[in-house]
Amino acid sequence: GHHRPFNDLGYAGVRIMEAHENYNRQHQDIRIEDGIEYGDVISGVNFKYAKKLTAVNAINLASLGWSPKEPKNVKIGGIVEPSTKLKWDISKDKNIIGYKIYWRKTTSPFWENSRLVGKVNNYKLNGIVIDNYLFGVSSISEKGYESVVVFPNDVF
């Protein structure tokens, strides 16, 4: 998708798309075959939906623009232990006032739990077993904006 070049350069990139594509309209040359119209044409554009999508993109871009830099070198520990440990490089950016830990069950598509942990470079989640959850860390700015959540990329 068009978001990949941004991701490849280290920028947050998101792809927003219609999940139920109409292959008579999309990815087709404009033509009529057996009475069926094919191709992307202006009469097939839902302008109310396009307006909403544009607003969502603008809001998300503003949010990303205001957000602080994400935590670097996020690592996870706690293998064969009853608790999970996370650590990361603490930022020298004075705008970052703290960090937030996220975790969710491995079967969940959404973050279910979070904890503000202050301006520290490590945290231990007692009683949270590493095998049962996915984890992430975000940075929080003094104005309350939050970076993208970073998954651990190494173990310790």
Set out the residue ranges of the language-model regions.
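Active-site-adjacent mobile loop/cap segments within catalytic or ligand-binding domains
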Residues: 1-68
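Conserved aromatic anchor
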Residues: 82-95
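Short beta-strand elements bearing conserved aromatic residues within extracellular beta-rich modules
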Residues: 98-101
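Proline-enriched interdomain boundary motifs that mark the N-terminal boundary
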Residues: 67-77
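Edge beta-strands of extracellular beta-sandwich domains
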Residues: 145-155
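Short beta-strand segments within Ig-like beta-sandwich modules, predominantly Fibronectin type-III
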Residues: 113-120
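Beta-strand-rich modules
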Residues: 123-147
